[in-house]
From Swiss-Prot:
GO cellular component: mitochondrial inner membrane; respiratory chain complex III
Protein's gene: MT-CYB
Residues where heme b b566 binds: 97, 196
GO biological process: mitochondrial electron transport, ubiquinol to cytochrome c
Protein name: Cytochrome b
GO molecular function: metal ion binding; ubiquinol-cytochrome-c reductase activity
Amino acid sequence: MTNIRKSHPLMKIINNAFIDLPAPSNISSWWNFGSLLGICLIFQILTGLFLAMHYTSDTTTAFSSVTHICRDVNYGWVIRYLHANGASMFFICLFIHVGRGLYYGSYMFLETWNIGVILLFTVMATAFMGYVLPWGQMSFWGATVITNLLSAIPYIGTDLVEWIWGGFSVDKATLTRFFAFHFILPFVITALAAVHLLFLHETGSNNPTGISSDMDKIPFHPYYTLKDILGALFMMLILLILVLFSPDLLGDPDNYTPANPLNTPPHIKPEWYFLFAYAILRSIPNKLGGVLALVASILILILMPMLHTSKQRSMMFRPLSQCLFWMLVADLITLTWIGGQPVEHPFIIIGQLASILYFLIILVLMPITSIIENNLLKW
């Protein structure tokens, strides 16, 4: 008799994806972040669901409903801070996951990679709309500034912004629709993640060497289930330390002031995970140019397979490309720091140089270095 795990229509899908899945024997801890992202997503949906039970999406009551959650709801403060800091963990895992893909050439799985880029955009949109919901000062002004960027689109820009706002400024209609979208998008993300996984399982996982591992596969369970559980425990530990000891470490103090359209905060800035893109946006004096650079900074990921000029898939045996990769990481950290600084003398020029370097490394230096490495192999 066949095991029910292998014969039942529903169990069979789970079995082929998480139990009997053939996995490369040499994938490192950098491959843990896909499962961590799945855990983050489920976690965010659950905490978000409980927050939505007590939240009201009205400009007059939104701020006080969040205060009510923190003060009056049983363990409401834990749920709220788990959700807020869970978003930070989500983005840390996302950035590492994308970085892993760049380093080991995982972008050569075209469908998986492109759906991954769409997922990144969707998660960023969801996080942005979630940041607006508490209706604090930074929520309101962040929403105003970021939605206003669309007015840079020629001809239809102004109409588009007013259509998104549902009026002539960020107001009740905007908050209500942002709550609706923030609630529905995580389920869209879940569906996209399933498709992402579907395409990945068509080809099988990449591995650190970038060489086919078909001749050396091991079952996903128990080897990688156990490894993923260890990774999840580490992530939970970091998240709980953050939530229980310094829940506001990554937040903005301005968001503890109720939204006031008549009073602009001295420094409008988004959450830390958007600062690198915000720095690129600010580094260009022209509004439309800045918006295009902002979109290009993420959309550039779609070009990665076309910019791959190396004969080797992975960077494991390419020291020159490795140097460039870590330069790119350092550059992104610099951009993140600059995005949180005021627009004044040393920061403006540092931001502009870091922005130029970001595009230069990806579009010019990496492909050229790969060609040089190809020629070095002939020696």
